[in-house]
Amino acid sequence: MAQMQIDPEAGRRIHGKPEPRVHIETFGCQMNEHDSEIMYGILAQMGYVKAQGPDDADLLLFNTCAVRESAVEHAFGRIGQLKPLKYTNPDLIIGVCGCVPQVEGQVERIKRMFPYLDLIFGTHNIHRLPELVERARSERETVVDVWESMGDDFPDILPAAREGDLKAWVTIMYGCDKHCTYCIVPTTRGKERSRPYEVILAEVQELARQGFKEITLLGQNVNAYGKDLYGRHGEGAFDFGDLIELIDRNSPGIERIRFTTNHPKDFTRKMVEQIARAEKVCEWFHLPVQSGSDSVLRRMKRSYNRKQYLRLVGWIRELIPDAVITTDIIVGFPGETEEEFQETLSLVEEVQYDAAFMFMYSERAGTPAAQMEDRLSVPEKKERLQRLMEVQNRIARAKNEARVGKVYDILVEGLDKGKPDVVFGWTRGNILVTFPGDESLRGRIVPVRITRAGTWTLEGELVESPVTLA
């Protein structure tokens, strides 16, 4: 098990002060959030402490997202907004990392837009952060270190300074091999690479010892876990379902297990059966469908069709009747006709999703879809998105209203923002619930009866005295 060796005096040496301060601004998905936790963990071992904000930082990092152009522009806007900090504090080290630098042409764009940056690096060499920060201090030019793939020296174990003490991300694999025609992730995150199950289990058990109650297993395609390490699925090789069973049986203290994100192509009935048997695994499945049209799915290169997707949904409904199913949908993909869009609407009606992330197609340079013709106008895409949202929001509202009067176990996370007498938490199905309570409930699982439903959230009341988690 490869681990990092970190000099605890590095931060002091770089900045000339005993406790240099670091601030990281994170954009994008859970993988980016966890990457930022890892960077905080590495920097803590170098002697850094978290800054209150960017204004009092000695090291400022922007962990960027490239999945849509709007995410890139959001990050760039924030980087430009904080430019004055470099002039008020010339010793401040500013770096840009994450997915955007991995995209062809973006490093040059970043350097052109922000010539005052000290450091640019990507997703594959976070473990080189100590060396990169030292170089950023000593070299006159912007340090650029972007790798095309994850090297063999990438450690299996990385330190992480996690946000909170109840819920934790646990990366089980990196990258994606699917190469959907609209998606930049294989470029930014590389090929699928699984972490050994022994390392994952050890991390989960350590989190349990630290008092964490819930873990989320992370990967761009968790259902492909193990293919690169243990062989093809379906031939007796250790796979994602086996990992779920292993963790479920060997993680005393962990009360809830979640996982994201799934790819329908690799999600087998065997995995659904194993999940159904695992007591700690929550009844929540995020199953990105992207479109309900077979012809659009082919153009997207999603590697499944509508019938196969609905078969997977059927397995879940059969084996886990209370399952909450959510999805991602893209409208306005190149060439999408009204008839194809209607197929997406009919799929949404058929599946009855509990929630959906719905987006207009966003062109990503370097992807095959960017070369496709028959593009829809922005007004057309907006109009279709609005129709889709109306259908999905109606379904979500009705499903939540059906939950009124029912009792759910809620893991309480803390006080609702700005409300000293209201707490919030989540059902096993990943639905947000608020109800009257105080800080003493934090970290407990309590039974809550739902009294009011919104489109996306629920309100409730305590049923009985709270039960402290074991």
UniProtKB/Swiss-Prot annotation:
Localisation per UniProt entry: Cytoplasm
Family the UniProt entry places it in: Belongs to the methylthiotransferase family. MiaB subfamily.
Enzyme class: transferase
EC number: 2.8.4.3
UniProt name for this protein: tRNA-2-methylthio-N(6)-dimethylallyladenosine synthase
Domain TRAM: 401-464
Function summary: Catalyzes the methylthiolation of N6-(dimethylallyl)adenosine (i(6)A), leading to the formation of 2-methylthio-N6-(dimethylallyl)adenosine (ms(2)i(6)A) at position 37 in tRNAs that read codons beginning with uridine.
Keyword flag tRNA processing: yes
Pfam (any one): Radical_SAM
Free-text cofactor note: Binds 2 [4Fe-4S] clusters. One cluster is coordinated with 3 cysteines and an exchangeable S-adenosyl-L-methionine.
Substrates-to-products reaction catalysed: N(6)-dimethylallyladenosine(37) in tRNA + (sulfur carrier)-SH + AH2 + 2 S-adenosyl-L-methionine = 2-methylsulfanyl-N(6)-dimethylallyladenosine(37) in tRNA + (sulfur carrier)-H + 5'-deoxyadenosine + L-methionine + A + S-adenosyl-L-homocysteine + 2 H(+)
